[in-house]
Amino acid sequence: MAILVEVSLWVLITITTIVSWQGFRNPAYFDKYLFEVEKITIDKQYYRLLSAGFLHTSWLHLIFNMVALYIFSVGVGHILGIVNFFTVYLGSMLIGNLLALYIHRRHEDYSAVGASGAVSGVIFSSICFMPQAEISFYFIPYTIPAWAFGLFFVLVSIYGIKKQADNIGHEAHLGGALAGIVISIFLSPHILKLNYFPILLMSVPAITFLLLIAYYPSMLLLPNHWYLTTKTAKETLKTNYDDLDDETALNELLEKVSAVGYYNLSKQEKKKLEELAKKIES
């Protein structure tokens, strides 16, 4: 069983790395599979709810998620078995992205990538089974109980969703974490009896918050500083690239990618960038 868990985990990490690398080198591929509200709700491209979990914005983003996945997955894999482990992983990825879709359903330009929701689910599954395990950080000379880390994680995610002051996918984190708890209880009901207090301590704030935003959506109608900043940057850097020669247009587009990120380009800009890339390749 131990060898099977290790092999399966490394296969998952390898697939995620290959898909992410393909996204790094091919903007069209990245754009085709990332999580984008408009593509999912209007164009019905539901596969993006899962495919986005295998893409990342950078090598650092990828490495951070895969290291966290490896650290917490071995224990969960041994306890639940391979099939149930992947149920937690993919289920958390899907539910995390569904929560992000619900919260950002009015933001058609919102997009995201990353395995963070799935990894959060695995982390919280691990905490459900081993709430008293000690978690340490390289930059802090102390350890904290896993359940305390889980509670802190939930509260930070709730604050991040409410504040909307950065480009971190707090919605996917919270949705994935809660999914990891629920799926683990479904697969192993006895853990609720054994570890009911830490599980409730992590779950109640998350469930309460989700119920509040379901019944009072106006709670989320605060200025989205990241969205406004990105929108302003887009408008400021807007250029008619058809009026420029290819070299100048390419330089302008690459400069904009550096400033606001590829997934914040308009559809026309992405199309123009792909056209210029094909010209260079030919």
Q: Language-model segments: what does each one mean?
A:
Residues 229-282:
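C-terminal regulatory/interaction regions
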Residues 1-244:
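A detector for small-residue-rich transmembrane helices and their helix-helix packing motifs
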